[in-house]
Amino acid sequence: MVDISMADVRLLRERLGVGVMDSRNALIEAGGDIERAVEILRLKGLKSAEKREGRSVSEGLVVSRQFATHAVLAELCCETDFVAKSDRFLALSERVADLVSDADSLETALRVRCDEGSVADLIALEAAVLGENVALRRFARVEGSRFSVYMHRTSSDLPPQVGVILAYEGHDDATARFIAQHIAFAAPEYLSVGDIPQGILQRERDLLTEISRGEGKPEEVLPQIVEGRLVKLYKQNVLLEQDYVRDNKVTISKVLEATGLRVISFARFRVGT
């Protein structure tokens, strides 16, 4: 049998975060070759990660990076809040955020190259060490030159679970910050009514028409009734139409008009939703 030194075992543990026996067995299988042992453990980690892929990931955190011309928001998920607040998971999220900072989609983010192969490989290997399914669930890139980034903790002992990036034009940074906070709490899906996909809008219009007809409303006034009821949909889902959370007597569009701000775009993630 190959003589395995504790120094090599310790080195392998430090590199991959695996247990003593796993490190020792990998070194034995690799004939004492540390790099080969690393590959053996990585392969085992990827295989064990595949077995966990179907398990629900409803915990985790959001992390962001901001640059001169763009900002990115990522949601890294795991199975339990215990892992979500662990130092290793937090370190993983920071490394992933750095690696994917130039990506333009979730698919390209997962393919970004790193020492472990790709970001997807890195996450799978760390999942093996953490013993949970871990996934980069969502990724958004927001273009612009001025940003307000707001990260919200839903619990003081957990990392941020709600994240918002707001790209805007104007100079009222304080109001931009308040609007980013508004987005975090009001959860709009669209910036303007024009951003709602026509298919979704038409389905909602058809549904409201049938509801109104079932209530016995006259056919000739159904279009007006439906359009009136669509206002509720807009209030729930469209940022510019929402009542401002700091003053519900005015809408976000009125706040922007009064302060000279213009929202270019935004991204919002809440872990597990």
Curated annotation (Swiss-Prot):
Pfam families, per database record: EF_TS
Alphabetical UniProt keywords: Cytoplasm, Elongation factor, Protein biosynthesis
GO molecular function, one term: translation elongation factor activity
PROSITE patterns in alphabetical order: EF_TS_2
TM ranges: none
CC per GO annotation: cytoplasm
Top-level lineage group: Bacteria
Cellular compartments annotated: Cytoplasm
Chain positions covered by the region annotation Involved in Mg(2+) ion dislocation from EF-Tu: 80-83
Function: Associates with the EF-Tu.GDP complex and induces the exchange of GDP to GTP. It remains bound to the aminoacyl-tRNA.EF-Tu.GTP complex up to the GTP hydrolysis stage on the ribosome.
The family this protein is said to belong to: Belongs to the EF-Ts family.
Listed HAMAP family: EF_Ts
Official protein name in the record: Elongation factor Ts
Gene: tsf
